[in-house]
Amino acid sequence: MRMTTRRVVAAVGIAALIGVGSIGGAQEIDPALGTYERAAGEVSGSLKCVGSDTMNNLVALWAEGFKKFYPSVREAVEGKGSASAPPALTEGTCTFGPMSRDMKPSEIDAFKERHGYPPVMVPAAIDMLAVFVHKDNPLAGLSLQQVDAIFSKNRTGGAKDEIRTWGDLGLEGEWKDKPISLYGRNATSGTYGYFKEHALFKGDFKPTVKEQPGSSAVVQAVASDRFAMGYSGIGYRTADVRVVPLAAKHGAAFVEADPKFAYSGDYPLSRFLYLGVNHKPGTALDPLRREFLRYVLSANGQGDVKKDGYLPVTAAVAKRALASVGIAAD
């Protein structure tokens, strides 16, 4: 794997978190994370975040919490999709680039050509990508090979046959002959890219997948279509849908989308949510970017993560993340 971005913990994986923090498997904030304290100097300017739709609500919560300490800061959050973050960072038209996936080599190369060094991808939260069905759907679980056979036209994961109907998954009665209505994201979305790589084994989506403009729209579509299936971040779950337990391979036990299984690495579609940063090695960040990252990776900022339905990072991860942009942990 090309490690051309300056990423902090993605190389060791989310499972490594279980050994570096004191939160265990619960969705709790690591008590070793300090409470954010206002900086002594002046912090002002425009805080503009361009990128992930999945992270849109979360980034807005961070900005809102940050402004309580620095009311003069102006904020703007544009959730256009993760693909919009790298060019905005490269061109200098944003302060941070939220992304729900890693940068592609071509995106990193474009940044390096302009600036002479790679961007930094700071892990700021943990997400579980979920497969949703209608709340009345009795499906017990899916292997990733079955997910691939449902959503992909290639079946790169090794499934012998295409899965088209609920009966193909063993459902009886009213479900048996009903086609599975598929909902997903478009190609600008980091969620689309992550699902394509990890659930479709880098295969191609079927043309019958109905692309939605955002994560919330996918969940709403599944909630209103009894015979639907869709994928989105776990933070968009509502009472009108069910999250399907997943197995990493055929014949393995189904794993619930539970925080303890994200931390342990047992849930097969866990991922980091990143803030992309333009940081020249050996230099100090300006006060606005420095303090925003300190807030995000504090107990306050990780409280926002939990509030929005995602999983907080540990103090050890936060310390390494801050160090990657030259910030000493409190």
Language model segments and positions:
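Basic/polar N-terminal segments that are highly enriched at the extreme N-terminus
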Residues: 1-2, 24-26
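Bacterial N-terminal signal peptides that target proteins for export
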Residues: 2-12
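Bacterial N-terminal signal peptides
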Residues: 11-21
